[in-house]
């Protein structure tokens, strides 16, 4: 497993995230509708909207997964925020970043991943 690097804009990114005051807030229908729609549109069992804090990935909304947060070290989203576009992992077992990641080897046993960084 390769832990995600820290993006060059980390200080500004974290400041913008905290300014939103969204971390650790209760579920909201407006976000849940987005994740449910994504699950249906892409025909995938799991969809979530995650925010990457300094040491964790926190799921604001999710469907098909009971996870509320994970360490940033094992997060797929930690890798996604390193770029500006869509990140696709077609088979996590064959990707050097993820093949031995506990999110891949243990439940939820992620195989396919597609993510896009959120920007404020």
What residues fall within each predicted segment?
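A short linear-motif detector with a strong N-terminal bias
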Residues: 2-3, 26-30, 37-39, 66-68, ...
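Sensor-regulatory modules in signal-transduction proteins
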Residues: 118-120
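Helix-loop-beta substructure at the N-terminus of cytosolic sensory domains
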Residues: 24-57
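Signal-transmission linkers at sensory-effector interfaces
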Residues: 1-29
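Regulatory sensory and allosteric helical modules in signal-transduction proteins
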Residues: 15-16, 45-46, 52-62, 67-114
């Amino acid at each position: 497993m390769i832990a995600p690097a820290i993006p060059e804009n980390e200080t500004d990114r974290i400041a913008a995230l905290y300014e939103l005051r969204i971390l650790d807030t209760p579920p909201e229908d407006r976000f849940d509708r987005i994740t449910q729609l994504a699950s249906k549109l892409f025909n995938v069992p799991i969809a979530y909207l995650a925010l990457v804090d300094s040491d964790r990935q926190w799921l604001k909304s999710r469907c098909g997964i009971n996870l509320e947060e994970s360490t940033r070290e094992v997060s797929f989203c930690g890798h996604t925020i390193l770029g500006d576009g869509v990140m696709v992992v077609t088979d996590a077992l064959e990707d050097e970043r993820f093949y031995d990641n506990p999110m891949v080897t243990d439940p939820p046993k992620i195989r396919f991943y597609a993510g896009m960084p959120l920007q404020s």
